[in-house]
From Swiss-Prot:
Location of the protein in the cell: Cytoplasm; Cell membrane; Nucleus
Domain notes for this protein: The EGFR-binding region prevents binding of a cyclin-like activator to the EGFR kinase domain, and thereby keeps EGFR in an inactive conformation. Also maintains EGFR in an inactive conformation by preventing formation of an asymmetric homodimer.
Composition bias, Basic and acidic residues: 310-323
Record key words, sorted: Acetylation, Cell membrane, Cytoplasm, Membrane, Nucleus, Phosphoprotein, Tumor suppressor
Post-translational modification Phosphothreonine, affected residues: 126, 130
UniProt name for this protein: ERBB receptor feedback inhibitor 1
Taxonomic lineage from the root: Eukaryota, Metazoa, Chordata, Craniata, Vertebrata
Pfam families: GTPase_binding (PF09027), Inhibitor_Mig-6 (PF11555)
Function recorded in the entry: Negative regulator of EGFR signaling in skin morphogenesis. Acts as a negative regulator for several EGFR family members, including ERBB2, ERBB3 and ERBB4. Inhibits EGFR catalytic activity by interfering with its dimerization. Inhibits autophosphorylation of EGFR, ERBB2 and ERBB4. Important for normal keratinocyte proliferation and differentiation. Plays a role in modulating the response to steroid hormones in the uterus. Required for normal response to progesterone in the uterus and for fertility. Mediates epithelial estrogen responses in the uterus by regulating ESR1 levels and activation.
GO cellular component terms listed in the entry, alphabetical order: cytoplasm; cytosol; nucleus; plasma membrane
Location of Phosphoserine modifications: 250, 271, 300, 458
Positions of post-translational N-acetylserine modification: 2
Subunit structure as annotated in this protein's UniProt entry: Interacts with EGFR and ERBB2.
Keyword hit for Nucleus: yes
Gene label: Errfi1
């Protein structure tokens, strides 16, 4: 609801016959408002700022004539016209001359009611519904100012804190004056010190944790700005647009880098020799030289220079130790002796040959416990050994054969005339015994033959 006029919906008393359908106002106050007591009991919703504005106005005030009221816009806030009668209305507003006693009496009643309301501070004076030319009361607030000569009163203070805070943030971020961030803010129409407000514009601090450059204190920035003002630069730097916001990815979401950090670069640009604005860079660590590329041709004949030291070469492998000969049953061919002309002689039998083995050696083997050795019988035909690799392998010689052989030997020594053929070894092979028996019959008187057979049978 604007303070330009009082709408009909703000006056809580029903209007009797004050307004006709054609929008013309009547000059009879008694038919419009009723009696004086009924008007004083009503409540008028008028802003107090308008009252203060009318109290302080020193110019003479007079009431304006009442124009036509549009019935189609009762809730818009501007109920009464400001430029006189509406072009739709053909009849001019009725004006009551001040010489009439009845009209003057009713005007005094209405003005006294407005005086009491203004003195009590409930509401301020507004253009009344009566078309009055002049005011005879000495109280200044009884009549409002002329609308054509006076501007509208200021807008009321908004009670919505969100709008105030939004305006402050927009003004703070879009300010082109960099000194405005460092010095005290110029007081504006808004009151920041009123308790209960939600604006924290004047009590904020700049957080330098989200800036990419080294930290600059507010005192240093203010001193630098003062120096710039005292000694102006003959070549002023080009203006930089501070309206561009930079998003800080390192800080929390929604944090923006304020343009105050650019002040240091602007202030120190006058003296290019100063190193204060340059960030401190630590000294570079010297990069060690690359190691020499190892030579992969060192074992070939291409390497003829001494460019590579001994440190680059791998350690020499000592010569391998000769493998010790193992006692395995199947030795490697390298361990066998080499033969002349590379020809291996024919294989030899591991059995003791009667030609090269004496009787003492055989007895020694038997006494050492070699009686369990198998009985080997060579193959002899016509008194000759047929093969040196093939022989008869007989079962072990039983121990009782030694007793028989001893008995025959003693009998032969006692009576050398009686020729007793010693019994051959009791072998399990029938063919061998048959052959021995036939040979004994064929050569009964041959002593050498018996001796040979004895050696052969009992080696």
């Amino acid at each position: 609801m604007s303070t330009a006029g009082v709408a009909a919906q703000d006056i809580r008393v029903p209007l009797k016959t004050g307004f006709l359908h054609n929008g013309q106002a009547l000059g009879n106050m008694k038919t419009c408002w009723g009696s004086r007591n009924e008007f004083e009991k009503n409540f008028l919703n008028i802003d107090p700022i308008t009252m203060a504005y009318n109290l302080n106005s020193p110019a003479p005030e007079h009431l304006t004539t009442l124009g036509c009221a549009s019935p189609s816009a009762p809730g818009s806030g501007h109920f009464f016209a400001e430029r006189g009668p509406s072009p739709k209305s053909s009849l001019p507003p009725l004006v009551i001359p001040p010489s009439e006693s009845s009209g003057q009496r009713e005007e005094d009643q209405v003005l006294c009611g407005f005086k009491k309301l203004s003195v009590n501070g409930v509401c301020a004076s507004t253009p009344p519904l009566t078309p009055i030319q002049s005011c005879s009361s000495p109280f200044p607030c009884a009549a409002p100012c002329d609308r054509s000569s006076r501007p509208l009163p200021p807008l009321p203070i908004s009670e919505d804190p969100s709008l105030d805070e939004a305006d402050c943030e927009v003004e703070f971020l879009t300010s082109a004056d960099t000194d405005f961030l460092l010095e005290d803010c110029v007081p504006s129409d808004f009151k920041y010190d009123v308790p209960g407000r939600r604006s924290f514009r004047g009590c904020g601090q700049i957080n330098y944790a989200y800036f990419d450059s080294p930290t600059v204190s507010v005192a240093d920035l203010s001193c630098a700005s003062d120096q710039n003002r005292v000694v102006p630069d003959p070549n002023p730097p080009p203006p930089q647009s501070h309206r561009r916001l930079r998003r800080s990815h390192s800080g929390p979401a929604g944090s923006f880098n304020k343009p105050a950090i650019r002040i240091s670069s602007c202030t120190h640009r006058a003296s290019p020799s100063s190193d204060e604005d340059k960030p401190e860079i630590p000294p570079r660590v010297p990069i060690p030289p690359r190691p020499a590329k190892p030579d992969y041709r060192r074992w070939s004949a291409e390497v003829t220079s001494n460019t590579y030291s001994d440190e680059d070469r791998p350690p020499k492998v000592p010569p391998r130790e000769p493998l010790s000969r193992s006692n395995s049953r199947t030795p490697s061919p390298k361990s066998l002796p080499s033969y002349l002309n590379g020809v291996m002689p024919p294989t030899q039998s591991f059995a003791p040959d009667p030609k090269y083995v004496s009787s003492k050696a055989l007895q020694r083997q038997s006494s050492e416990g070699s009686a369990k050795a198998p009985c080997i019988l060579p193959i002899i035909e016509n008194g000759k050994k047929v093969s040196s690799t093939h022989y008869y392998l007989l079962p072990e010689r039983p121990p009782y054969l030694d007793k028989y052989e001893k008995y025959f030997r003693e009998a032969e020594e006692a009576n050398p005339s009686t020729q007793i053929q010693p019994l051959p070894a009791a072998c399990g092979m029938v063919s061998a015994t048959d052959k021995l028996a036939s040979r004994m019959k064929m050569d009964v008187g041959g002593h050498g033959k018996r001796k040979h057979l004895s050696y052969v049978v009992s080696p």
